[in-house]
Amino acid sequence: SLRNKGLTKKIKSDNTPVSNGDLEVDKIISTKLKELTPSIPIISEETSDNKSIEDLKDFWLVDPIDGTYDYINNLEEFTINAGLILDRKPVAGLICAPAKKRMFYSYGEGNAYEFINGNEVKIDGSRNFNKDIIKFVSYSNKIKPEIQIIFDKLNVKEHTKMKSSLKFCVVATGEFDGYVAEPRACEWDIAAGHAILKHSGGLVTDFDNNEILYGKKDFKNPSLILKSKMLV
């Protein structure tokens, strides 16, 4: 693999890293999606500078490697992501975490799955749910006051730092019950995970409980609250 030999990296204009691994995965995914859905545009983190989404309602959102830092440094929490947006809403998603040997996908309400030992296992937010110990994933070990307010409101007892879109997956399964984030992520960071969590029965909104729609200017997301089916 490129992680073991021939990996190169550079810093993008937004001060985030990109590797030749990102670009190779991007090329593979884009080629396959063009074969599957030739009429649907593809918007990728690595090619977004060249894309215009004005008035675009149907498109793919791809993040070839979410968690490039982990990928470059031989850590495990990076993911490969593709989400299909129709009428500005997520209708299908695929997330693969190769180093953790985990894959998740969804294609409609009630159809969210994890591929485990060659089997398609339905996920519905109930895997480790304990109503007495509400557990959230977090972007940082240090919780900001505005996020702590939401934690208190939701009676969150524990939080664990986690990177990449894997956060959406572990909330969808019920390994964790939710996630709260300030405006930081771009649309390609969350589209696949949003679909998977939504189709597992969970919910993704902003801090004001508004639905998250796609095709926004500059691909920027607002604040986010993720809830598993058991908290909805």
Regions found by a protein language model. Name each.
Residues E54-Y113:
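DPxDG-like acidic metal-binding loop motif
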Residues P41, K157-E158, L203:
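Conserved beta-strand segments of alpha/beta enzyme cores
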Residues Q148-K153, F168-V232:
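Oxyanion/phosphate-interacting regions
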Residues E45, K161-M162, F207:
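Conserved beta-strand termini and adjacent loop/short-helix elements that scaffold enzyme active sites
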Residues G110-V121, L231-V232:
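Short helix-loop capping/hinge motifs at secondary-structure junctions, enriched
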Residues S126-P145, L154-M162:
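Short loop->beta-strand "edge-of-pocket" segments that line small-molecule binding or catalytic clefts
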Residues S1-I65, I149-D152, C169:
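N-terminal subdomain of lithium-sensitive/metallo-dependent phosphomonoesterases centered on the IMPase/IPPase/PAP
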Residues K57-F59, V91, I134, D177, ...:
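Conserved acidic residues
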